[in-house]
Each structure stands twice: as structure tokens, then as C-alpha cells.
Curated annotation (Swiss-Prot):
Keyword annotations from UniProtKB, A to Z: Ribonucleoprotein, Ribosomal protein, RNA-binding, rRNA-binding
Organism: Synechococcus elongatus (strain ATCC 33912 / PCC 7942 / FACHB-805)
PANTHER family given in the database record: MITOCHONDRIAL RIBOSOMAL PROTEIN L24
Gene (UniProt): rplX
Pfam families: KOW, ribosomal_L24
Subunit structure: Part of the 50S ribosomal subunit.
SMART domains associated with the record: KOW (SM00739)
Name recorded for this polypeptide: Large ribosomal subunit protein uL24
């Protein structure tokens, strides 16, 4: 049986956004989005969902390493975070007076873009 394709949802965060994790073992952690994977609706957040990877030595005489790196989490488990108000909020999309579409935090009304 063939593997099912993941359902694509629109991702509400972009690279460089500050987000707070709202579910999982790192709940409450605030970090910066390093990378977004829109096809699988996943994001890579700095300092969240850390995994240890054992790397074999590549050349003779070189020693192996244990590397700690971030693993991706689903975008539904993060909310945009306001650094000024210190609160996480859902996102609303609105238009400015000049016609640009911008993201706005629902709790504070702060415009992100």
C-alpha cells in the first residue's frame, strides 16, 4: 500500500518569526523560526525539539562526535509571540490603507509584517 501524502495547510509563520511552543514536551519555550517546510506544514525552531545524533568518524584518526540539533515540529504547535507584550497569539490577516496584506496578532493588534 502506498504511503499517503501529508495534508497541506497554509503555514502562518515565516522564517525569522519569534514563536512560542503551545504543545508537546517543549511547551512554553520561545524561539526563532530557522526554517519552514510548507509541504509538510512543519517548522524548525531554535532550541526546540533537540535530538542527539551520533556521527561516525569520516577519516582515519578522526574521532566520532555526538551532535545535538533541532528537529522539526508541526506548525499547529506554535503561535506567533509578541516580544514587546510577552504574549503568544493567533494570527489574523488584514489589509493596510495602502492595500498591503499584513499579519496581525489577534490578542494585541500588533502588526507583524
Amino acid at each position: 500500500m502506498a504511503a499517503q501524502k501529508p495534508v497541506r495547510h497554509s503555514v502562518h509563520v515565516k522564517k525569522g518569526d519569534t514563536v512560542q511552543v503551545i504543545a508537546g514536551k517543549d511547551k512554553g519555550t520561545v524561539g526563532e523560526v530557522l526554517q519552514v517546510f510548507p509541504k509538510t506544514s512543519r517548522v524548525l525552531v531554535k532550541g526546540v525539539n533537540l535530538r542527539t545524533k551520533h556521527v561516525k568518524p569520516r577519516q582515519e584518526g578522526e574521532s566520532g562526535q555526538i551532535v545535538v540539533e533541532e528537529a522539526s515540529i508541526h506548525s499547529s504547535n506554535v503561535q506567533l509571540y509578541s516580544t514587546t507584550q510577552k504574549v503568544a497569539s493567533r494570527v489574523a490577516y488584514t489589509f493596510t490603507e495602502d492595500g498591503r496584506k499584513v499579519r496581525k496578532l489577534k490578542k494585541t493588534g500588533e502588526i507583524i509584517d
